[in-house]
Amino acid sequence: MAESLRERGAEVVFFGSESGLERELVPKAGFGLHALPLSGLAGGPASRARASLLFARAVVRCRALLRELRPGAVLGVGGYASAPAVAAARLLGIPTFIHEQNSVPGKVNRAAGRFAREVLVAFPDAARRFGRAVRAAHVGMPTRRQFFSASREEALRRLGLEPPVVLVFGGSGGALRINLAAAEAFRGQTPYSVVQISGRRDFPRLSSDNPRHRILEYAEDIWHHVTAADVVVIRGGAGSLFDVAAVGRAAIVVPYPHHRDNQQLLNARYFTERGAAELLPDHEVDAKTLRGRVEELLGDGERRLRMASSMRSLATPRAAEEVAERMLAAGREGTG
C-alpha cells in the first residue's frame, strides 16, 4: 500500500510501536517512521493502567505530529500500535480508512470502523461483520508485486535449490510446534528440497542432518522462496495466505489455535473451501503427520496443479492500488 501511494506522488509516513517489527522494517523500505512507546492491555491492573497512560500520551503525540504533517488521509491496519494515530486523526477531522486483513475483525478495527470514512477488507465475509452502520468494501489483501512477477526458474537459481521444493514458513513470529515437527520430519535423506523459515525465536533450537533441508531464521526475499516451492506449509495469517495466492502454490495451512475468535481458522477456511489449500489442525501436527501430508501432495501432480490454480484465482493483485486510490481521492476532497 505504501509503495502504491508513493508511486502516485504521495509522501508516506508510518506511525508504529517502539518495540514492533516496524522499527526495523519500515526504514529499510525507505519510509519515515514515528515510533511510539506503547504497551498492550494484557496483564494485571497495574499493567493495564500503564498501557492506558501510554496510549493517552501517544494520542497527544500523534495529534501534534498530524498537525505538523497535515496528511490528506490516515490508514489504520489494526492492532494497538495503529490506534493512537487513528484516534488523533478522528479528533482532527482527517479522513480515516481502516484495512482489515482477517476474516474476523480485531477489536481496534471494530472500534475504529465506526467513525472511519470507509473500512476496506481482505476477505469478502469480513465486511458484514462490521455491521450495517459501517461503510465497508472488499478490496482484497495488498501484496507486494514481487510475488506476482517472480519467475520460478530465477527463484530456483538464486536460492540454489533443486526441485521439488517444500517451503515451511510459520510467519514472522514463527510457530514452535510446526518448526519442531519439520526439523524432525525431514531428517536423513529426502528426494526433495526443504526450506524451513523458522523465525528468530525458534531458530537456535533447530537443526537437521539432511543436506537438502535448509533452516533459515528469516528470508527477506520470501517471494523467491514461495515461487520456488511446489508445496507450502504455512500458518493461517492473511498475509501469508495471500502471498501464496499471488504465486499460486498448493498449501497446507496450520492455523494458530489460540485466537479467541478462531481468526486464522476462518482465514484458512476461505481457501480450503475453494479447493486452494488443505487444513491441518495444530494439535495434529507431528513429524510423521507433517511428512505424510507433504509427500502425499508431492506425489499427486494433478491435485497440486488444481490447488495452485484455485489458489491463484483468489489473489487480489489490485488491492494496494484500490486502497491508494481511495485515500488519495479523500485527501483531494479534504474532509473527514
UniProtKB/Swiss-Prot annotation:
Gene3D superfamilies the UniProt entry points to: Glycogen Phosphorylase B
Pfam families: Glyco_tran_28_C, Glyco_transf_28
GO BP field: carbohydrate metabolic process; cell division; cell wall organization; lipid glycosylation; peptidoglycan biosynthetic process; regulation of cell shape
EC number(s) per entry: 2.4.1.227
Entry keywords, A to Z: Cell cycle, Cell division, Cell membrane, Cell shape, Cell wall biogenesis/degradation, Glycosyltransferase, Membrane, Peptidoglycan synthesis, Transferase
UniProt GO cellular component terms: plasma membrane
Organism domain of life: Bacteria
Catalytic activity: di-trans,octa-cis-undecaprenyl diphospho-N-acetyl-alpha-D-muramoyl-L-alanyl-D-glutamyl-meso-2,6-diaminopimeloyl-D-alanyl-D-alanine + UDP-N-acetyl-alpha-D-glucosamine = di-trans,octa-cis-undecaprenyl diphospho-[N-acetyl-alpha-D-glucosaminyl-(1->4)]-N-acetyl-alpha-D-muramoyl-L-alanyl-D-glutamyl-meso-2,6-diaminopimeloyl-D-alanyl-D-alanine + UDP + H(+)
Main localization, broad class: membrane
GO molecular function: UDP-N-acetyl-D-glucosamine:N-acetylmuramoyl-L-alanyl-D-glutamyl-meso-2,6-diaminopimelyl-D-alanyl-D-alanine-diphosphoundecaprenol 4-beta-N-acetylglucosaminlytransferase activity; undecaprenyldiphospho-muramoylpentapeptide beta-N-acetylglucosaminyltransferase activity
Annotated membrane topology: Peripheral membrane protein
Keyword Cell membrane appears in the UniProt entry: yes
CDD domains: GT28_MurG
The family this protein is said to belong to: Belongs to the glycosyltransferase 28 family. MurG subfamily.
PANTHER family given in the database record: GLYCOSYLTRANSFERASE, UDP-N-ACETYLGLUCOSAMINE--N-ACETYLMURAMYL-(PENTAPEPTIDE) PYROPHOSPHORYL-UNDECAPRENOL N-ACETYLGLUCOSAMINE TRANSFERASE 1
Record's function text: Cell wall formation. Catalyzes the transfer of a GlcNAc subunit on undecaprenyl-pyrophosphoryl-MurNAc-pentapeptide (lipid intermediate I) to form undecaprenyl-pyrophosphoryl-MurNAc-(pentapeptide)GlcNAc (lipid intermediate II).
Protein's UniProt name: UDP-N-acetylglucosamine--N-acetylmuramyl-(pentapeptide) pyrophosphoryl-undecaprenol N-acetylglucosamine transferase
Species per Swiss-Prot/TrEMBL record: Rubrobacter xylanophilus (strain DSM 9941 / JCM 11954 / NBRC 16129 / PRD-1)
Record lineage: Bacteria, Bacillati, Actinomycetota, Rubrobacteria, Rubrobacterales
